[in-house]
Amino acid sequence: MTNYVAIDIGGTNIKYGLIDQDGQLVESHEVATEAHKGGPHILQKTKDIVASYLEKGPVAGVAISSAGMVDPDKGEIFYAGPQIPNYAGTQFKKEIEESFQVPCEIENDVNCAGLAEAVSGSGKGAGITLCLTIGTGIGGCLIIDGQIFHGFSNSACEVGYMHMQDGAFQDLASTTALVEYVAKAHGEEVGHWNGRRIFKEATEGNKLCMEGIDRMVDYLGKGLANICYVANPEVVILGGGIMGQEAILKPKIRKALKNTLVPSLAEKTRLEFAHHQNTAGMLGAYYHFKTKQS
């Protein structure tokens, strides 16, 4: 049976596993990224994962999803934030192919998550899919007819940096922004709060927590509306850990979009939450690999 190694490199953890020729995840594992140790360390960890699978038998390829800005044609990272030192310039495709003589492809993690949703998740069958991941920051991707829209310099849909009246989109509508707002409202340290606690206390009647959620949703709705006016997606898919609170967030976000978009656009723009959770990066990396290698 033909198998592919799929690796999803995040700032906290590296998820990896085997995907078979039918696109099914056969097994999956997780290891700490140790991002503070930098790009060379992450590259070596990736090589160790590939080597461990090759010891058990042949693989048809290595599909990688990674944080940072990725040039999928060169197969390398061309920009990464300070959270992962010396990551920019890491040549995954070249290093993996030269070390193991197997084909390798790499793509940005949010693009991979969006591709997974467009191919086999909440966006299946849609012509234009906008996918946003809400977490520490906000990442975005646009999938058009099953293809990732990269833009001229592989920087399309970096919506977290989008300027809004009160600051950058991700500084207003991310999980980080929510936690910081609620902590400040309570006069407490940020470390005392997280998304899970905020939603729990909001449902128990904590007005400051609900106020923080409503504030985040308001900014999220405005940012989403701006993107929808430009891209006119058929479906908007929201992912990230905090979107697990779908029962609370979905009606609020739907209302925010309805209040911000013109009626004709609001009626025709479908809002969904991500179907694939922890496996999205690996599945999307596999779909990207198959497209690049076809």
Predicted regions located by residue number:
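ATP-binding/phosphotransfer module of carbohydrate and carboxylate kinases, centering on a glycine-rich
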Residues: 1-61, 71-74, 98-104, 116-128, ...
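Hydrophobic "anchor" residues
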Residues: 25, 77, 148-149
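Residue-level detector of high-confidence beta-strand sites
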Residues: 28-30, 80, 151
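A short acidic/small-residue loop/turn micro-motif
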Residues: 33-34, 85, 156-158
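A charged helix-plus-loop insertion that forms the helical arch/lid used to bind
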Residues: 76-89
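Short loop/edge segments at beta-strand edges and connector loops
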Residues: 106-110
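Glycine-rich phosphate-binding loop of actin/hexokinase-like ATP-binding domains
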Residues: 124-176
